[in-house]
């Protein structure tokens, strides 16, 4: 694995990993390619959409052929944080970890604040030696000493310090974006509220049918519904929706226009896309 992703693992006589140097940055950091493709200044918080975590996991010699097929099906930029617990396969697009300072609940399904998800991933996915408990999911993991919980506050503070990146110069049509801003206020701001871009800060969740997205992943979670996703730096991280089912922002706008019967013309949809690119 060191040759593939730059992390090292130690295994025992049964080929079980006993130590692995995996961190949040594996999935939530990339580089600006300023030296050459794949080499440059680090960009923490940016989703690593080149990472094929499933293919890496599938290299394990102790996995069954059936499980290897599941892991290999995910593709680059996706990960299923529940497959090892419930055996169901609905991988998610790796989300950004920037712009979270004003966001109440992390994750697509808003099961808890950022430290909740950090603990979940550290303990249930990364093999961290710590505690995680969620009776809603039937998870109760205790480890002594707890080496995860004491680190959560500092990790949260660092993540809260990561701003959403502004759009590159000349990456959108400013006049169209201005028209799109008016359309956004009329058609989208009920759910994408104020500066945070989400109504979940007030506790709101949405059934999959409300947005036309697949509900299989939400059904596996504690809330059984989706959070309105914040919109800052949308330009940076296609594809969209939790499962990557929308390749472009134009696809996103077209889907909501259809599902919510908003009635935008083709020109209005283009203007709205330019506004979203400006965020």
Residue ranges and their predicted role:
Residues 1-156, 160-177, 182-279:
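Electron-transfer interface patches adjacent to heme c in soluble/periplasmic c-type cytochromes
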């Amino acid at each position: 694995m060191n040759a593939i992703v730059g992390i090292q693992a130690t295994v025992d006589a049964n080929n079980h990993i006993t130590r692995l140097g995996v961190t949040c940055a594996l999935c939530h950091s990339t580089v600006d390619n300023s030296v050459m493709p794949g080499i440059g200044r680090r960009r923490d918080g940016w989703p690593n959409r080149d990472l094929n975590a499933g293919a890496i996991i599938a290299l394990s010699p102790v996995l069954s052929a059936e499980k290897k097929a599941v892991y290999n099906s995910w593709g680059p930029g996706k990960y299923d944080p529940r497959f090892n617990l419930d055996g169901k396969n609905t991988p998610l697009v790796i989300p950004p970890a920037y712009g979270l300072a004003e966001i109440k609940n992390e994750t697509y399904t808003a099961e808890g604040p950022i430290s909740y998800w950090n603990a979940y991933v550290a303990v249930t996915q990364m093999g961290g030696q710590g505690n995680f408990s969620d009776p809603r999911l039937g998870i109760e993991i205790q480890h002594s000493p707890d080496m995860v919980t004491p680190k959560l506050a500092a990790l949260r503070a660092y993540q809260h310090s990561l701003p959403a990146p502004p759009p590159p110069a000349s990456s959108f049509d400013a006049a169209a974006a201005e028209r799109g801003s008016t359309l956004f206020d009329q058609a989208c701001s009920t759910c994408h509220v104020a500066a945070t871009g989400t109504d979940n800060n007030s506790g709101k969740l949405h059934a999959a049918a409300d947005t036309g997205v697949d509900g299989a992943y939400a059904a596996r979670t504690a809330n059984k519904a989706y959070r309105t996703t914040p919109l800052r730096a949308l330009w940076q991280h296609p594809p969209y929706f939790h499962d990557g089912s929308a390749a472009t922002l134009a696809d996103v706008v077209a889907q909501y226009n259809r599902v919510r019967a908003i009635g935008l013309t083709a020109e209005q949809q283009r203007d709205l896309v330019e506004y979203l690119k400006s965020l």
